[in-house]
Amino acid sequence: WRERTNAYVEELTSNIQLAYEKTFGAHSINAVIGFEAIKRDTPKSWLHAIPASNSLHLIYYDTIDKYEDTGNNTEARLGWLGRFNYNYANKYLIDFSARYDGSWKFPPNHRWGFFPSASLGWRISEENFWKESKIASVFSDLKIRGSYGLVGDDNVDGYSAFDYMTGYDYKQGGGVIDGSYIIGTTPRNLPVTTLSWAKAKILDIGLDVAFLNNRLSGSVDFFRRIKTGIPASRDDVLLPEEVGFERPKENLNSNVHTGYDLLARWSDKVNDFHYSISANFTYSRFYNWEQYNPKFSNSWDEYRNSTWHRFGNVNWAYEADGQFQSWEEIASWPIDNDQKGNTTLRPGD
């Protein structure tokens, strides 16, 4: 037998932008507005044949006994964007930006999301009082900056495109009836009608500094990201067992990433040879933040298994007092480790 799978990726992307720049005196402004559209198709087909001869690895139309068009997973996104930047004498920096995005994944009433952000910067080293001070001979550059924004994510876990629709899923197994293979269908889960974008609020505060005519430079950043709208089900909503489906997903949970970045760089040249050496360090911790209606059997269960406002990806484990060195030590050990009188233990355990 022979089989062949043909798969394609067809993506059409449109990106239109209009930019404006203007400088007057010490003032400089920059503005951009744009439109973006993405459509992606992934058609796929599979065919099977029983050739008259196995000597040639070919598939002929006359010998094809099965053909399956496994469908076309269409994706589509549409968005509007805008940005405004203001710069005064390279000292005061202001930037505003925003996106208005729509995703094919979500139901029509929850398909669009608005995601703004803003950043401010102050280059202290460009101030006259700084240039006139003795400390200016040490610092080549000093800048304080901060930003805060909202970012959307439609790649939500536990949710597939068109889960907001009712009906049936095609090509879900099958069976042989009267000598013919019949492709099966299954009813879809309860429609997800309220799920929308997961959103991340991101705060960043940083300091840029340079010394020795910018040969030695570095930066320090503190960041905090709060992601809300993580899909989860309302387990306090009771459904009869006869329903046979899980509870629909909603934007209920959240998590947090917080930490800091450090960067140091040395740049110089020897004659016409330019070189730079840099090092960076990042510390980040992940927290499971809000969870919808967690349930525990008792306070000990909550202490051991709750993830509410706790570090994520932390597992409980045993603390080892050491290894048994002899049979005598095992025989005198007061704790029944294996629940069999320690008869399964050996030196080295």
Protein language model regions, located:
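Extracellular/periplasmic, surface-exposed regions of secreted and cell-surface proteins
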Residues: 1-319
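Extracytoplasmic gating/loop element in the C-terminal half of outer-membrane beta-barrel translocons
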Residues: 103, 316, 323-327, 332-349
